Structures are given as structure tokens and as C-alpha cells.
């Protein structure tokens, strides 16, 4: 499909929906990016330990990550949770379709063993030096305040409301 055709394909249903209210459609993806692994597991975070392309268990993913980093010294274990959000907005049926992209990051260091139970995925192994604990050890309110998803969503809200 040509880009112009795709644009038309997306624009027309948006125009119909925007006759009553602005329409915002967003999609996101998140992952853990480890510097010593050249950004892996990245977009494959949920399937990192998978052998068949399906999602792997959190435990299997964490075990694979820690195994791959076993020989990496403490000073070289930097990583970030990253959330990318893309959104399209149509404020009125005759207006242009607006495109937005935001990114939120939560930088830290991969610990040598899992810690904490407040979370999922790689939360038990992303250590945040400024808090002295892994993400899974943070209280929910604190975790929500610093999360990569929260940062990306706040950027999107700022852009949306900042020009609305």
C-alpha cells in the first residue's frame, strides 16, 4: 500500500469519528535496553528467552539476562526501561491529522540477582542507584511516578493539551 493510500485509509474513519469529539489513537511498546548487550533485549523483551517466538515467562527472561551479563563488571551494567508511544490526533473532521511520538526512559543498572516483589518483567533486576533499590522494591506510588510509561504518557499529555 502506498503511503498516500494508507494516509487516506486512516484519515477517513478518523474524520467520521471526529464529527462529535476529537479522536486520539495511541499505541505503545516498552522494553529493557541493556547497554552491554547493544540494546537487547529491547523490543524482544517479553520474548527474550523464548525458543518459539511466543512470550517467555518473566523468570526465564530474567534468568537469561543475568546469565548473559554474568561476566560483565558492575560498572558496565547500565540499562534503561524504555517506552515509546506514537499517537494520531484529529481535532475536527476538516482539520489535519496530527502525529505525535514520545519516549520515556527509566535508567538504572542491572543487579546481579532479583530483588523485590512489587512488579513484573525485569523490575526485580533494574537497580535504581538514586533510590538504593530495584524497581520491584519501590512502593507503587513511587514506581508510578518514575516509570518509563508514565514519563512517555505525561509527554504525550503535555503535547496534546499544550496545543489544544
Task: Place the predicted regions along the sequence by residue.
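Anionic-ligand binding patches
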Residues: 1-164
Amino acid at each position: 500500500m502506498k503511503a498516500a493510500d494508507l494516509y487516506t485509509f486512516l484519515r477517513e474513519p478518523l474524520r467520521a469519528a471526529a464529527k462529535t469529539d476529537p479522536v486520539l489513537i495511541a499505541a505503545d511498546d516498552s522494553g529493557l535496553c541493556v547497554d552491554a548487550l547493544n540494546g537487547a533485549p529491547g523490543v524482544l523483551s517479553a520474548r527474550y528467552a523464548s525458543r518459539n517466538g511466543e512470550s517467555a515467562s518473566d523468570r526465564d527472561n530474567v534468568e537469561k539476562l543475568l546469565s548473559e551479563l554474568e561476566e560483565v563488571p558492575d560498572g558496565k551494567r547500565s540499562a534503561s526501561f524504555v517506552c515509546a508511544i506514537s499517537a494520531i490526533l484529529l481535532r475536527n473532521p476538516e482539520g489535519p491529522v496530527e502525529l505525535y511520538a514520545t519516549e520515556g526512559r527509566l535508567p538504572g543498572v542491572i543487579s546481579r540477582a532479583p530483588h523485590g516483589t512489587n512488579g513484573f518483567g525485569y523490575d526485580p533486576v533494574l537497580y535504581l542507584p538514586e533510590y538504593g533499590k530495584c524497581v520491584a522494591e519501590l512502593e507503587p506510588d513511587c514506581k508510578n511516578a518514575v516509570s518509563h510509561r508514565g514519563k512517555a504518557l505525561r509527554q504525550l499529555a503535555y503535547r496534546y493539551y499544550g496545543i489544544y
